[in-house]
Regions:
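Peptidoglycan cell-wall recognition and remodeling modules
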Residues: 1-88
């Protein structure tokens, strides 16, 4: 997760991506893991704060998304320091 967070937000919990396809579609990536609101709403942990910019809530939503989509973080290129960055 540390590699993914560094690549996605450079450890900035207030990071907002205002230029990619998600932003152009009205749902910018936000927070440490650069989660979009649609994913956050669907994947947030019920015990975590309901705030996409909250570091704990953002990371929990990202982990739930990774588990759903990839099964394991080992299959996420963006989280592998030996591979070039790639969105997840």
């Amino acid at each position: 997760m540390m590699v993914l967070i560094e690549r996605e937000s450079n450890f900035n919990p207030n990071a907002v991506n205002g230029w990619d396809s998600n932003a152009k579609g009205g749902d910018p990536s936000r927070g440490l893991c650069q989660v979009i609101m649609a994913t956050f709403v669907w994947c947030k942990h019920p015990g975590a704060p309901n705030d996409i910019m909250n570091p704990l809530a953002n990371i929990c939503a990202a982990i739930n998304w990774i588990k759903f989509k990839y099964g394991d973080i080992r299959f996420v290129q963006q989280a592998n320091k030996n591979l070039p960055p790639k969105g997840y």
